[in-house]
Amino acid sequence: MHPNMKMWIGWAACAFLLFACLGTLTEGYPTKPDNPGEDAPAEELAKYYSALRHYINLITRQRYGKRSSADTLISDLLIGETESHPQTRYEDHLVW
């Protein structure tokens, strides 16, 4: 085999593995519910809106814990407000 052909086989294998990994990541993401249409009965529309609300809550939920980066953690610890010393709403005090 030529060195150029080995390189192309290597790139093809890497691309295949990349697409396989991306495929497994998208399977974990929730799917959007199907719209029943404008002329659907009220019961189906209620089920659809309930499923849609659940879907939106899943994809927009806040994530805590290990997903926080060290930079934001340090800045929250240094600048964050506490119950005994809350931050003011205005950075500069008004001068009369």
From Swiss-Prot:
It comes from Cyprinus carpio. CDD domains: PAH (cd00126). This is Pro-neuropeptide Y. Residues 1-28 form the signal peptide. The keyword Signal applies. The gene is npy. It is found in: Secreted. Gene3D superfamilies: 6.10.250.900. The modification Tyrosine amide is found at residue 64. One of its GO terms (cellular component) is extracellular space. NPY is implicated in the control of feeding and in secretion of gonadotrophin-release hormone.
